[in-house]
Swiss-Prot record:
Required for the export of heme to the periplasm for the biogenesis of c-type cytochromes. Belongs to the CcmC/CycZ/HelC family. This is Heme exporter protein C. It holds the Pfam family Cytochrom_C_asm. The chain crosses the membrane at residues 19-39, 61-81, 92-112, 126-146, 157-177, 198-218. It is a multi-pass membrane protein. GO terms for cellular component: plasma membrane. Keywords: Cell inner membrane, Cell membrane, Cytochrome c-type biogenesis, Membrane, Transmembrane, Transmembrane helix, Transport. InterPro entries: Cyt_c_assembly, Cyt_c_biogenesis_CcmC, Cyt_c_biogenesis_CcsA/CcmC. It is found in: Cell inner membrane.
Amino acid sequence: MTLIDLANPTRFLALTARVLPWLAAATVILLAIGLYQSALAPDDYQQGATVKIMFIHVPNAWLSMFVWGVMSIASLGTLVWRHPLADVAAKAAAPIGAAFTFLALLTGSLWGRPMWGTYWEWDARLTSVLILFLMYLGLMALWRAVDDPSRAARAAAVLTLVGAINLPIIKFSVDWWNTLHQPASVMRMGGSSLDKSFLIPLLVMAIAFTLLFVTLHLAAMRNEILRRRVRSLQMMQASRMAFSSEMGAGSRQNNASNEVGAA
């Protein structure tokens, strides 16, 4: 099946109906394995047991940026290729991305309290992630505020692509500025600096959370497609009722005119 085939909403619904149960099962299994391995991971010699917040915080932080990247690609599909499902994909991803970003901020604050002595600092990375969260909320508000779906899709696509400039700022903020966050320890030149007892559970949790996003995203896209179909049917029904009312009114006027003429 090609991308052109997936452009057909009916085929997309049929495919995802078959795939989603398997994705959900894989997500649950990997989450269970990851949580079990995270619980068995040793305490850090400096951070103690609080280091285990990392197994939730890092996947959420990674997905907060990944989801915006997915939305940026979908926005290109809206503006350049006019893919029928591009706006559906972007709109369905926004609430999920906002949730991951909120969880990243929340778990980061809980992790930062014992390490930094405070829940919040106007650190470069913290601030840029907060801006990302606000951008998610802004896009969600835009889709709700604009009644015309095509106008909303184009406006959201432009804002998403403009907002993508924040992604490298988040990623490289620890290198460009003096921040409280440590430099990358998993994906870096020369290999990861994490011990395997931390690295393996972290990677399992990252894959599990990514599968969770894919599962939620496909389910949300299905709901959005069905919602738009219902809205389209409601508009068609309203148009038919309005047309029937006009025809009925016109018929009554003609009958009244004929009666007057006969009299």
